[in-house]
A protein has these predicted regions:
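Bacterial Sec-dependent signal peptides at the C-terminal "C-region" and cleavage site
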Residues: 4-8, 12-26
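Catalytic-core regions of hydrolytic enzymes
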Residues: 23-133, 141
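Short alpha-helical functional segments enriched in proximate histidine and acidic residues
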Residues: 63, 138, 198, 202
Length: 203
C-alpha cells in the first residue's frame, strides 16, 4: 500500500510539474526605434524624434527582468537603418510582435495625444489589429496624455513585417505638454513601463 501511495504521489507531482512547464511561455518582441542617424524624424525646437524613441527603447530593454520575455531591438545607438534593413531584421527573428516607436508632429500646436497604428495590408493584419487595440487600452489606463485610439495605415514597416506589428506614435512634440512629457525622464519611464506591462500580459 505504501509503495502504491508513493507511485500515486509521484504521478501527481509529475503531472503538476508538466502543467507548470506547459504554462511557461517564452515570447520574443522586437522594439523598433524609428529613424536614426541622418534621419531625424519629427523635430521641434530641441526635441528630436530619433533621440526620444531610442531612449524609450533602451528603457524597455533595461526594465525587463522576465527571463521568458526576449526583447530584441533594431537600434540602441544613433545610427541610420533603412526600412528594408528593419524588415529583414524582424523577419529573420520572426518575433511574436513588433512594436515600432515614433513621435508625431503637427503644424497645429494644439494637436496632442498618442496613436496606435496597424496595417490591414499585412499578412498578420487581424492579429496586428488585436494587438493594437489591447496596447491602446493599456496606454489609456497608464499614460496621462490624450489617447487618440487605434488607426489603420499602410506604413511600410507594418505591411512588410511577416508577423503582427504595430506603431505607437507616443505623442506630438509640436505640442508643449506632449513634448515636455516625452523629453522628461519620468515620462519616458512611464511609457516604457506601460509597454512592458502590455508585453507581460501576452504571456
Amino acid at each position: 500500500m505504501k509503495n502504491l501511495f508513493k507511485v500515486a504521489l509521484l504521478v501527481v507531482s509529475f503531472a503538476t510539474l508538466s502543467f507548470i512547464t506547459a504554462e511557461k511561455k517564452e515570447i520574443n518582441i522586437v522594439i523598433d526605434a524609428g529613424h536614426g542617424g541622418h534621419d531625424l524624424g519629427a523635430t521641434h525646437e530641441e526635441a528630436l524624434e530619433k533621440s526620444i524613441v531610442v531612449e524609450v527603447t533602451k528603457k524597455i530593454q533595461s526594465l525587463n527582468t522576465d527571463a521568458d520575455i526576449k526583447i530584441h531591438v533594431t537600434r540602441t545607438e544613433d545610427h541610420f537603418l533603412s526600412l528594408q534593413e528593419r524588415a529583414n531584421f524582424i523577419n529573420k527573428i520572426k518575433p511574436d510582435l513588433v512594436i515600432s516607436l515614433h513621435t508625431n508632429s503637427n503644424k497645429n500646436s494644439t494637436t496632442t495625444g498618442i496613436e496606435t497604428f496597424y496595417s490591414d495590408k499585412s499578412i498578420a493584419a487581424l492579429k496586428s489589429e488585436e494587438m493594437a487595440n489591447k496596447l491602446s487600452e493599456v496606454i489609456a489606463k497608464n499614460i496621462p496624455l490624450n489617447n487618440r485610439g487605434v488607426k489603420k495605415a499602410p506604413f511600410w514597416i507594418l505591411s512588410k513585417s511577416e508577423v503582427p506589428a504595430v506603431i505607437v506614435e507616443m505623442g506630438f512634440i509640436s505640442n508643449q505638454n506632449d513634448k515636455d512629457y516625452l523629453t522628461n525622464e519620468k515620462g519616458q519611464n512611464e511609457i516604457a513601463k506601460t509597454i512592458l506591462e502590455f508585453i507581460e500580459g501576452l504571456k
